[in-house]
Regions:
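Signature of Gram-negative outer-membrane beta-barrel scaffolds
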Residues: 1-38, 42, 53, 64-65, ...
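Residues that define the transmembrane beta-barrel architecture of outer-membrane proteins
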Residues: 4, 25-27, 83-87, 140-144, ...
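Gram-negative outer-membrane beta-barrel transporters
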Residues: 4-9, 109-112, 130, 134-227
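Repeated loop/turn-to-beta-strand initiation elements of outer-membrane beta-barrel proteins
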Residues: 7-10, 40-43, 97-102, 157-160, ...
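Transmembrane beta-barrel strands of outer-membrane/channel proteins
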Residues: 12-16, 31, 45-49, 58, ...
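Outer-membrane beta-barrel "beta-signal"
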Residues: 32-34, 88-91, 291-298
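Membrane-embedded beta-barrel scaffold of Gram-negative outer-membrane proteins
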Residues: 36, 44, 78-136, 142
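C-terminal beta-signal and adjacent terminal beta-strands/loops
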Residues: 114, 217-226, 251-298
Length: 298
């Protein structure tokens, strides 16, 4: 249900889900309060509950290779659904500086997680002799941070958009990421950078021609590196920062009425910001991959 007038709106709702791996019905509530003190200022407070079912994920369907042995993922017995309670406060601001239209969004967020999914390697292999890692319910976790996004339309042919997120992601209790090194325990969540952002610049000097420059920034993060060809013993690595810049040119050729042919070309990852320390050989860690998916490509 939603109640609103010109300045205020209040939305209250919920969702019921039934999953075949969960014995009970899951209720996820949500609430939203909006206040517009002026036409160009939008203030909002939001709460949302959510869940993630104890199921196999896409990455579980791919068999990894660690130290020359296959690694498969299984679900622990009595694995519970992961639950979340998320809160956010945001200010959405609009202003015009002469002919330049701008928009600034500032948002703070906090998420409390229960029955968080985590992975641990089991001592015994499966019937086929594969090394097995088990998805189980670890302790709770918290994610909080600040998101800032800005947009500006300088002219009809030039627009700029950029965003930056600062966040912290921690388990309530330290977790050993690899059973071979139980002393290496971390509260920090693996593969979650504290800083990441993006930008997009679009140029349309003539009607059918568009040039765009985009970028993605990924800050340093913690990634597990299992023993193999790269390292003798398992170690958690702090990755380097990455700044990926892409360029694209596009031109539209009208063919007939509503039919248009677009020809485009460009460079992906112009800065060649790419992982430098891949494992090699039969005993590599195939899961030790991070950062942009491609090197400089044309």
């Amino acid at each position: 249900n939603e109640w609103k007038n010109k300045q205020w709106s209040f939305l209250l709702g919920g969702r019921l889900d039934k999953h075949n791996l969960v014995n009970h019905i899951i209720f996820s509530p949500r609430a939203n309060l909006r206040f517009n003190p002026t036409e160009n200022v939008n203030l909002r407070i939001t709460y949302a509950g959510g869940f993630r079912a104890p199921q196999a994920f896409d990455e579980d369907l791919h068999v990894g290779v660690v130290g020359g042995e296959r690694l498969v993922t299984v679900l622990a017995d009595n694995l519970k659904e992961e639950r979340s309670n998320s809160f956010s406060v945001s200010a959405d601001l609009y202003h015009k500086f002469g002919n330049v239209q701008t928009n600034l969004l500032i948002e703070g967020f906090y998420t409390d997680l229960d029955h968080v999914f985590a992975l641990r390697q089991l001592d015994k292999p499966d019937a086929q002799g594969n090394t097995v890692q088990e998805r189980y319910n670890a302790y709770g976790a918290k994610v909080l941070g600040l998101n800032i996004e800005g947009k500006a339309m300088f002219t009809r042919w030039f627009t700029l958009q950029a965003g930056l997120t600062l966040q912290q992601s921690h388990y309530d209790e330290a977790i050993a990421w690899n059973d071979e090194v139980p002393e290496q325990k971390y509260k920090k969540m693996m593969r979650t950078p504290n800083t990441y952002g993006y930008f997009t610049a679009s140029f349309t000097p003539v009607k059918r021609f568009t040039a765009s420059v985009t970028g993605n920034y990924t800050g340093s993060m913690l990634v597990g590196h299992s023993a193999g060809s790269g390292v003798e013993d398992p170690v958690a690595v702090h990755t380097p920062k990455f700044m990926e810049v892409n360029m694209k040119l596009a031109y539209d050729f009208p063919i007939y009425k509503y039919l248009t042919l677009q020809v485009n070309g460009g460079i992906q990852n112009l800065t060649n910001s790419y992982q430098k320390d891949f494992d090699k050989g039969w005993n590599r860690d195939s899961n030790y991959i991070y950062g942009p998916s491609l090197p400089r490509s044309y």
